Amino acid sequence: MAIKERVGIVVSNKMDKTVVVAVESRSPHPKYGKIVVKTKKFKAHDEENQCQEGDKVRIQETRPLSKTKRWQVINIMSHSS
């Protein structure tokens, strides 16, 4: 089975070694066809505490690390200005 990867924006880094990443998905409405943007938040493991709010990051699914944390940060694609 393929390992899931997502790209999103860091919305919170207040926890130790954990960031909250908001991932947007765009899909057409089943009846009306308009593109609907849905946002889902994932808690991801950030071992070195490098991520800042607003950074664009790539996260990868991993084994459960805590009650709600099942993703880890692979790399920081761009830093916030």
From Swiss-Prot:
Pfam families: Ribosomal_S17. SUPFAM superfamilies: Nucleic acid-binding proteins. It comes from the Bacteria. Gene3D superfamilies: Nucleic acid-binding proteins (2.40.50.140). InterPro entries: NA-bd_OB-fold, Ribosomal_uS17, Ribosomal_uS17_bact/chlr, Ribosomal_uS17_CS. GO terms for biological process: translation. One of its GO terms (molecular function) is structural constituent of ribosome. Keywords: Ribonucleoprotein, Ribosomal protein, RNA-binding, rRNA-binding. GO terms for cellular component: cytosolic small ribosomal subunit. One of the primary rRNA binding proteins, it binds specifically to the 5'-end of 16S ribosomal RNA. Belongs to the universal ribosomal protein uS17 family. NCBIfam families: PRK05610.1 (NF004123), uS17_bact (TIGR03635). PANTHER family: 40S RIBOSOMAL PROTEIN S11 FAMILY MEMBER, SMALL RIBOSOMAL SUBUNIT PROTEIN US17M. Part of the 30S ribosomal subunit. This is Small ribosomal subunit protein uS17.
